Swiss-Prot record:
GO cellular component: cytoplasm
Gene that produces this protein: tusA
Domain of life where this protein originates: Bacteria
Protein name: Sulfur carrier protein TusA
Pathway membership: tRNA modification
The keyword Cytoplasm is annotated on this UniProt entry: yes
GO BP, sorted A to Z: tRNA wobble position uridine thiolation
Pfam families in UniProt: TusA
Cellular localisation: Cytoplasm
Native organism taxonomy: Bacteria, Pseudomonadati, Pseudomonadota, Gammaproteobacteria, Enterobacterales
Amino acid sequence: MPDAFAAADQTLDARGLRCPEPVMMVRKAVRHMADGQTLLIISDDPATTRDIPGFCQFMEHTLLAQATEQLPYRYLLRKGRAAA
């Protein structure tokens, strides 16, 4: 089974940071990315299980994958929405 997280364009390691810092760092990273690029977010903050999906929905980015069964949590975000 291929690792969906392995081919990310960029990686943001937010381990050790607590809400709201991980989402603030994600927002800053995404601002410097081109539409369609992907960002792997690594975090150990339990609040990210709610905050990262909410951020993606609010900012109209695509959450391609998430692994929250064990630490560290991993999320794969694509900047922007998929073309319809």
